[in-house]
């Protein structure tokens, strides 16, 4: 595989406290059932985060390539983790807009989604992210 990538930009809106249906934030925002089922891990730092996955056959679509929802979910999660690293405690974020461009498919191997905060305003945080495979 070549080292082409998937590019993604995101805008997140900051939310303070509980929202509709009294949803309570997870005590560990880097771990949730869907993430555990898919099997990717998250590492975050100051203004950045990376989601990593060892792709196997369960992640492939009927055409033998990674289902597009897998890297998309990893990107969204990494970007959310990057945002959470720069916003005040007690706040959380929700994605308000995502634009993706899939440049080529990925197969079995290792993929990483790396997100970096580009600009953090008072209510909206802009994040850039990219998926690479090895």
Describe each PLM feature range.
Residues 1-134:
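Terminal targeting signals and extreme-terminal segments of soluble enzymes
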């Amino acid at each position: 595989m070549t080292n082409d990538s998937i590019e993604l930009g995101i805008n997140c809106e900051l939310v303070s406290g509980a929202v509709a249906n009294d949803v309570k934030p997870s005590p560990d925002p880097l771990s949730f059932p869907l993430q555990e089922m898919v099997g990717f891990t998250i590492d975050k730092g100051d203004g950045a985060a990376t989601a990593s996955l060892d792709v196997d056959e369960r992640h492939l679509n009927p055409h033998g390539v990674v289902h597009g929802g897998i890297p998309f979910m990893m990107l969204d999660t990494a970007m959310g983790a990057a945002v959470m690293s720069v916003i005040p405690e007690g706040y959380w974020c929700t994605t308000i807009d995502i634009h993706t461009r899939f440049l080529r498919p990925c197969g079995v191997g290792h993929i990483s989604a790396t997100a970096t905060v580009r600009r953090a305003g008072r209510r909206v945080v802009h994040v850039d992210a990219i998926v690479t495979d090895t």
